[in-house]
Amino acid sequence: MGEHQNVKLNRTVKAAVLTVSDTRDFDTDKGGQCVRQLLQADDVEVSDAHYTIVKDEKVAITTQVKKWLEEDIDVIITTGGTGIAQRDVTIEAVKPLLTKEIEGFGELFRYLSYVEDVGTRALLSRAVAGTVNNKLIFSIPGSTGAVKLALEKLIKPELNHLIHELTK
């Protein structure tokens, strides 16, 4: 891969945040709130209409993601439902929608999780990223540790570059 300078976009990046949980609400959703705050700190727009919570149900997840794919959004980040529990179905809902999977994201996320956060428990993560036409989707665990790691180490440093690549 060639060298890439930091890409500056001539517009505001727009994101949507979807928390997948049977137990969280807007007051207790630390993971989704953390994603929103970290994005907004980098001037990424996350409007109230583009932050919501759905149950751990494949149809609910797919319906919300498809709705946002029709809107003026650059990136969708889902939190929660990426493990191996019976109710963890985010990956099953999101992966079939992807036009292209960004395999390196999941690989790097699990590696960094192992080294910097949860040790061998990283093998339980099925975090995934990919594209749907000219939009990005990242599905990450809902813990604030996982959110910070994914956003600070992987997503935010490459977000503008990824969007630039999708739109050229």
UniProtKB/Swiss-Prot annotation:
Entries under Pfam families matching the protein: MoCF_biosynth
Disulfide bonds: none
Organism listed in the record: Staphylococcus aureus (strain COL)
Record NCBIfam families: molyb_syn (TIGR00177)
Record's protein name: Molybdenum cofactor biosynthesis protein B
Family indicated by similarity: Belongs to the MoaB/Mog family.
Superkingdom of origin organism: Bacteria
Keywords, in A-Z order: Molybdenum cofactor biosynthesis
SMART domains tied to this protein: MoCF_biosynth (SM00852)
PANTHER family attached to this UniProt entry: MOLYBDENUM COFACTOR BIOSYNTHESIS PROTEIN B
The protein's annotated pathway: Cofactor biosynthesis; molybdopterin biosynthesis
Function: May be involved in the biosynthesis of molybdopterin.
One GO cellular component term: cytosol
Gene transcribed to yield this protein: moaB
GO biological process, one term: Mo-molybdopterin cofactor biosynthetic process
Classification via Gene3D superfamilies: MoaB/Mog-like domain
